Swiss-Prot record:
Family matches, as InterPro entries: Ribosomal_uL18_bac-type, Ribosomal_uL18_bac/euk
Role according to the record: This is one of the proteins that bind and probably mediate the attachment of the 5S RNA into the large ribosomal subunit, where it forms part of the central protuberance.
A GO cellular-component term linked to this record: cytosolic large ribosomal subunit
Protein family membership: Belongs to the universal ribosomal protein uL18 family.
Renumbered residue ranges of the record's region Disordered: 1-22
GO BP term, pick one: translation
Gene: rplR
Protein name: Large ribosomal subunit protein uL18
UniProtKB keywords: Ribonucleoprotein, Ribosomal protein, RNA-binding, rRNA-binding
Keyword rRNA-binding annotated: yes
Gene Ontology MF terms: 5S rRNA binding; structural constituent of ribosome
C-alpha cells in the first residue's frame, strides 16, 4: 500500500525530532502548517513549556491579512514570533520544520524570523 503525504510528513517529523531538541539556552522553533493557517512556537523541551507563540489566527494578524495560507502571512507570523521571543531574551533557537519541506511558506516564516533577529 502506498504511503500518503500525511504519513510521509509524520515519518519525516519523527526522524527530525530524534535529532532536534530545545533546551533552555537554545529552545526549538516549531512550525505547524495546515492548509489554511500556519502556527509557530518557541518551545523549551526540557521543561516542556512554550515560551512564545504566534499564528495566523491571532486577531491583529487575521484582520490585516487576506488569507492565512500565503507566504506573506507566514512571514508576518515569523516576524511576530521572533519579536515575542526576543522580548523574552531568546536570541538563538533550533528550527523544527515539522516534517514539512523547507520551501514556500515554511521558508518564508524562517527567513522573516531570521530578519527579525533570531539566529538559527
Amino acid at each position: 500500500m502506498k504511503t500518503t503525504r500525511k504519513e510521509s510528513l509524520k515519518r519525516r517529523h519523527r526522524r527530525i525530532r530524534r535529532k532536534v531538541s530545545g533546551t533552555p539556552d537554545c529552545p526549538r522553533l516549531a512550525v505547524f502548517r495546515s492548509n489554511h493557517h500556519i502556527y509557530a512556537q518557541i518551545i523549551d523541551d526540557v521543561a516542556q513549556h512554550t515560551l512564545a507563540a504566534a499564528s495566523t489566527l491571532e486577531p491583529d494578524l487575521r484582520n490585516s491579512l487576506s488569507s492565512g495560507a500565503t507566504c506573506e502571512a507566514s512571514a508576518a507570523v515569523g516576524k511576530l514570533v521572533a519579536e515575542r521571543g526576543m522580548a523574552k531574551g531568546i536570541e538563538q533557537v533550533v528550527f523544527d520544520r515539522g516534517g514539512n519541506l523547507y520551501h514556500g511558506r515554511v521558508k518564508a516564516l524562517a527567513d522573516a524570523a531570521r530578519e527579525a533577529g533570531l539566529q538559527f
